[in-house]
Amino acid sequence: MSGKIKIGINGFGRIGRLVMRATMLRPDIEVVAINDPFIDAEYMAYMFKYDSVHKTWPGHVNGSKDGFLVEGRKIHTFTESDPSKINWGAAGADIVIESTGVFTDIAKATAHLTGGAKKVIITAPSNDAPMYVMGVNHEKYNPATDHIISNASCTTNCLAPLAKVVNSKFGIKEGLMTTVHATTATQKTVDGPSKKDWRGGRAVNGNIIPSSTGAAKAVGKVLPELKGKLTGMAFRVPTNDVSVVDLTVTLEKATTYEDIMKALKEASEGEMKGVLAYTDEDVVSSDFVTDPASCTVDAKAGIMLSPTFVKLVAWYDNEWGYSNRVVDLALHVAKKAAVKV
């Protein structure tokens, strides 16, 4: 036994592939199986190796009809549409990363347990699964009852650490969030049908598209003290990766912008190091491609109108930062549950 935590990935899309890349950079976790009904092993290898945003994987990757090999290690591959038919147990996967965007509630995600998985982490918000954000409420994870959990969204992972620090130090009376969000796979390259979201059906290139997001309200689930105090919306913009949160809040306690930045900087160097980061340089979005932090506070971009009314700005690589938190959460779950350590 290698001593590494063994995980499986269901859905080899943007997050699935980047979660795998993130595990390759860690000594204590490895992917042993991948399921995707739309991709064979040869195509998996190609999609893993070449990435338009995060560049070519520098190591050895090979895919054939016989399997998918990374750095000489064979990855079990499945092409099942029904998650209950995936033999995770035979592949040795104890924790499954559910990254299809389809099986996002407890009833659907529980199907992975039938195949031998012990725990499931959903890489999307869930209506009923407990939601955990690293650096915010992950210590509340209960291995005895939490078999299916959610890692929330990339935007919630950026917003929640920021809101936690500000609320704990100065108190948030109420606030509005806007995320200027990079393109995602659900958007269209040319105008097309989108019955539930007409504006979302417009071409991604050449448009700034207003959109809804539950990210701000979801903060109330991981930080109950902020329930009902935050809401927000999104603008989808034609960039490949990296998004930015604008959090505008009314504070309970009068303060200065400098003191807020001091509190955030201290948190980034202390209890939230690795999750929350801080910069006072003249940065732009591309500077954060493949940045592993959930949230990087931009000290120069924020503004304050009065001692209790402030706009805070924070960057996040909505793909790579989030994928690293998925891996962190899997390691935390394994540690708490003592899964094959």
From Swiss-Prot:
This is Glyceraldehyde-3-phosphate dehydrogenase, cytosolic. It is found in: Cytoplasm. It catalyses: D-glyceraldehyde 3-phosphate + phosphate + NAD(+) = (2R)-3-phospho-glyceroyl phosphate + NADH + H(+). Keywords: Cytoplasm, Glycolysis, NAD, Oxidoreductase. Its EC number is 1.2.1.12. The lineage of its organism: Eukaryota, Viridiplantae, Chlorophyta, core chlorophytes, Chlorophyceae. Pathway: Carbohydrate degradation; glycolysis; pyruvate from D-glyceraldehyde 3-phosphate: step 1/5. NAD(+) binds at residues 14-15, 36, 318. Coiled coil: none annotated. The record marks 181 as: Activates thiol group during catalysis. The active site is at 154 (nucleophile). One of its GO terms (cellular component) is cytoplasm. Belongs to the glyceraldehyde-3-phosphate dehydrogenase family. Algae contain three forms of GAPDH: two cytosolic forms which participate in glycolysis and one chloroplastic form which participates in photosynthesis. These three forms are encoded by distinct genes. GO terms for molecular function: glyceraldehyde-3-phosphate dehydrogenase (NAD+) (phosphorylating) activity; NAD binding; NADP binding. SMART domains: Gp_dh_N (SM00846). Key enzyme in glycolysis that catalyzes the first step of the pathway by converting D-glyceraldehyde 3-phosphate (G3P) into 3-phospho-D-glyceroyl phosphate. Essential for the maintenance of cellular ATP levels and carbohydrate metabolism. It is an enzyme of class 1 (oxidoreductase). Pfam families: Gp_dh_C (PF02800), Gp_dh_N (PF00044). One of its GO terms (biological process) is glycolytic process. D-glyceraldehyde 3-phosphate binds at residues 153-155, 184, 213-214, 236. Its main location: cytoplasm. Homotetramer.
